[in-house]
Amino acid sequence: MKIAIFGASGKTGILTVYQALDKGHQVTAFARNASSVTITHKNIGIIQGNILDYEKVKQAVEGQDAIISALGINKLGKNTILSDGTGNILRAMEECQVKRFICMSAAGILKNDAGFFFGKIIIPLILRQVYEDKIRQMELIKQSHVEWIIIRPTGLTDAPKTGSYKITAGNPVSSRIPRADVADFMLKLLTNKQYDGQLPAISS
């Protein structure tokens, strides 16, 4: 399958790229800094660009079978990069007639799905503006005409891939999940349509 991965230079994104190549996919890795994607493989193409640059986004989307977004925000404070960037992806998908979109978000975007400490203390006091943009991103995707799945991982760790994780419709089972397992789940969703139009939580 031909897939574009946005956020390819991030910790979860780069793991998704590696695993996708291992599974035989043809990957277009979209990264703000191409030098941070140090992979040599016959099935990878790298596009350096800003997610807010629509023409660059469209270049990455055109000709793909599916799109994976592992975009993240690396700074606190008011920010619209997720919603604006995702808007560019969705616009390009519709123009290029690419239907399938798997998006990584986070536990906490739905009411009461992040647990008391994180949901009632950390998000409101520290991450409020970050989560406001994640919610804007979610609403854009839900209003789109693509085949979408938004996954809600809990706290991401750098532990090795286990291949064993819990998927729930509501609250996640635990507070942690290896990034490598999140990557594994997103790649499975390329062909597994069980969760289409849903927001499954993933946790260990």
Give the location of each predicted region.
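N-terminal Rossmann NAD(P)H-binding glycine-rich loop of SDR-like oxidoreductase domains
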Residues: 3-23
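N-terminal Rossmann-fold cofactor-binding loop
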Residues: 30-35, 50-51
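Conserved Rossmann-fold cofactor-binding substructure of NAD(P)-dependent oxidoreductases
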Residues: 45-64
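N-terminal Rossmann-like NAD(P) cofactor-binding module of classical short-chain dehydrogenase/reductase
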Residues: 61, 65-68, 102
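NAD(P)-cofactor binding segment of oxidoreductase domains
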Residues: 74-101, 130-132, 136
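Substrate-positioning beta->alpha
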Residues: 84, 151, 177-187, 198
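Conserved beta-loop-beta element that borders a ligand/cofactor-binding pocket
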Residues: 138-160
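Glycine/proline-rich active-site loop of Rossmann-fold NAD(P)-dependent oxidoreductases
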Residues: 144, 160-164, 189-198
